Regions:
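Sec-dependent N-terminal signal peptides
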Residues: 4-15
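Sec/Tat signal peptide C-region and signal peptidase I cleavage site
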Residues: 16-20
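Start-of-domain marker
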Residues: 22-57
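Stable alpha-helical elements in mature extracytoplasmic
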Residues: 36, 104-108, 207-215
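A mature extracytoplasmic/lumenal domain signature
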Residues: 36-38, 46-47, 166-168, 197-200
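Conserved polar/disulfide-associated segments of primarily extracytoplasmic proteins
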Residues: 55-174
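Short, surface-exposed beta-strand/loop micro-motifs that present aromatic residues
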Residues: 178-189
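Surface-exposed amphipathic alpha-helical segments
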Residues: 190-226
Length: 226
């Protein structure tokens, strides 16, 4: 099974460039700048990025609830036979509230810890994601058994960001594939969170510290761009 087909099975909700790129979009008529994690490139205009935008949009149509996609980024190789690691950036509209950014980030951190530590919540979330994912795969003619966001939880947080991890597993044509997803959420306004996700093959080495560091830096730099 080639990497692109493997990617199709597990895609979800997680040579390097020498500098960090920035991406911009509008939120409620306000220009927002975000920092792309170091070592990754904007994939908006290549084949992989265009496909990913379509695939994630189809997942949402099939019932996947999650951040609104703003950007897909890749490993800068522009090679469909070598797509890992890759990731995306999304936004979460929290809604109008009377909290400061600092208060909302703290509340966000606590909520993530509580929800991802609650077995019934994680089971329901996993089931919903798996159904949306499998239905989307069927749209592309792929049949697979998938287990998403296993072994999930908060691995680190501070006043600026919360970082989580999860494991995705799939079996297709008798072949098993495992991915690790590292994600982060940072509040840049009291009603807007920026979520980053990096996905890689689980057997690609010690990834948690490496990707957590990249997401922490990208999140903190993004918060300074506001």
């Amino acid at each position: 099974m080639n990497n692109f087909k493997c990617f199709l099975i597990l895609t979800i909700l997680f040579a390097s460039s020498a500098f960090a790129e920035k991406h911009q979009f509008y939120y409620k008529n306000e220009l927002i700048l975000v920092e792309i994690p170091e070592g990754f490139c904007d994939a908006s205009e290549n084949e992989f990025g265009e496909f990913m935008v379509e695939f994630i949009d189809n997942q949402r149509k099939n019932g996947m609830d999650g951040p609104e996609l703003q950007l897909v980024f890749d490993n800068c190789l522009d090679d469909l036979s070598n797509i890992y690691p890759w990731g995306y950036i999304g936004t979460v509209d929290i809604g109008q509230n009377n909290y400061t950014i600092e208060e909302m980030q703290n509340l966000f951190n606590l909520t993530m810890q509580e929800q991802l530590g609650e077995a019934s919540y994680v089971k329901k979330l996993s089931s919903d994601l798996e159904n949306a994912h499998k239905n989307t795969l069927k749209d592309y003619g792929v049949e697979a058994e998938v287990n998403l966001i296993q072994d999930t939880g908060v691995i680190w947080y501070d006043e600026d960001v919360v970082i989580i991890k999860g494991i995705n597993t799939s079996v297709s044509d008798g072949e098993k594939l495992e991915e690790i997803v590292i994600g982060s959420s940072t509040l840049i306004k009291n009603d807007l969170a920026i979520n980053f996700y990096i996905t890689d093959l689980l057997d690609n080495g010690n990834l948690i510290l490496n990707y957590s560091s990249k997401l922490e830096k990208a999140s903190k730099k993004t918060s300074l761009l506001v």
